[in-house]
C-alpha cells in the first residue's frame, strides 16, 4: 500500500490539477503515468451543464469509438427466426429466446452486452431485476433494443461505449488502453465529445461541456483544454 501511495504522490506532483492541458499533452501525461503491470484503461470524465434530477436533462446514449476500446466483449442477443441467424453471422456469442432467459435466471451471465429485438422485450422485461443492477438491461436509447440486431452486434464488437450522466451530471467512459497511441486516444475522445454535443438536451442552459479530464486506471486526472480538442478534430 505504501508503494501505491508513493507512486500516486509522484504522479500528482507531475500534474497541475488546475491547468488545462492541450489534448495531446494531456493524453501523453496519462499514458506516461500508466506504469501498472497491466494495460490500464484510459478513462474520461466529462462534467456537463445539466441538472440530472430532471428527466429531460439526463444525457444517455452510445457511440462507436473509431479506434475501438481495446477490450473484447461477449454479446448475448435475445431474438428468434431470421434475426437469430443474422445475429450469429454478425458475431454474437450467445443467441436465444426463452432458452436464453432460462439461463439468465439460473445465473449464467457469461456476457458483457445484451441486445434484444423488440419482440423479445416481453421476455427480457422479466429479467430486469437480474440484468438491471449489472447495467445489462437493453434500452433503445443506447441502440440495444433494435429490429436490426446484426448491426447492433457489429457495433458492440467494434468498440461501442454507452454513456449516461450520473447523479452529479458527469459522464464516465473508457476511450481505450494505455497501449493505444496518442492519435487513437484523441480520435476516440473526439468521437465521444462529438456524440455528447449532439445529445445536448434542449433544456440545458449555459455552458454545456464544463470540464473534461482524462486518467488511467491507477493514475491521476488531467484536465483537457477543449479548444485544442476542437482544433485537432
Curated annotation (Swiss-Prot):
- Tell me which UniProt keywords the record has, alphabetically: Repressor, Ribonucleoprotein, Ribosomal protein, RNA-binding, rRNA-binding, Translation regulation, tRNA-binding
Q: Which PROSITE patterns match?
A: RIBOSOMAL_L1
User: What is the disulfide pattern of this chain?
Assistant: none
Q: Which domain of life is it from?
A: Bacteria
Record flagged with keyword tRNA-binding: yes
Kindly list the GO CC terms recorded for this protein.
Answer: cytosolic large ribosomal subunit
Positions of transmembrane segments: none
Q: Which family does it belong to?
A: Belongs to the universal ribosomal protein uL1 family.
Q: What is this protein called?
A: Large ribosomal subunit protein uL1
Please give the organism: Laribacter hongkongensis (strain HLHK9)
